[in-house]
Amino acid sequence: MKFSYLYLTLLIIWVEPLKANVDINEIIDNMYYEIVNTKKKYLSIKSNLRSPYINNYSLYTNYLDSLRLLAGNLEIKRQKLFLSIIDIDLSDEDIYFINELNNNSILLFNIINSFGRIYDTYLINMISSEYSLEQYSLDMESLLRLEKKYSLFKL
């Protein structure tokens, strides 16, 4: 009888950490794929916005709204990541991966918002000459440097 209790106790000790690892791995994988999918959607919107075939103002505003939604959804997913790991015992490796995911998520969020701000400013000032082509070029150059500097698009 004592052997059964000992066996049961050991089984619980060994099974619980495995259960936690499966949950944390699933959480990490979900956030990773969320970042990758958001990056793909961002690149798609970016290429469509820069297309010479778009000449309708309403299409531009639709794309800008899509960028806002994309950034908002990414921020919500990032917050859910931290809410979901509150009660999980994390290893050093898990903490490292979560930190990397958090950094990439924040970086992608900032890049999406920067790109949206550039095009929003461009659209608002398209009729007037307050936002020059030179300023637009400088803004886009700094955005591209930000994308390359952090190697975000090697995910």
Label the predicted regions.
Residues 64-130:
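Long, amphipathic, charge-rich alpha-helical segments that form helical bundles/coiled-coils
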Residues 24-53, 104-155:
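C-terminal amphipathic alpha-helix
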Residues 40-79:
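N-terminal, post-signal-peptide region of Sec/Tat-exported proteins
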Residues 5-6, 10, 45, 49, ...:
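Extended non-catalytic scaffold regions that mediate assembly and binding
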Residues 23-33, 61-68, 98:
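Short, charge/polar-rich alpha-helical segments
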Residues 1-22:
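Classical Sec-dependent N-terminal signal peptides that target proteins to the secretory pathway
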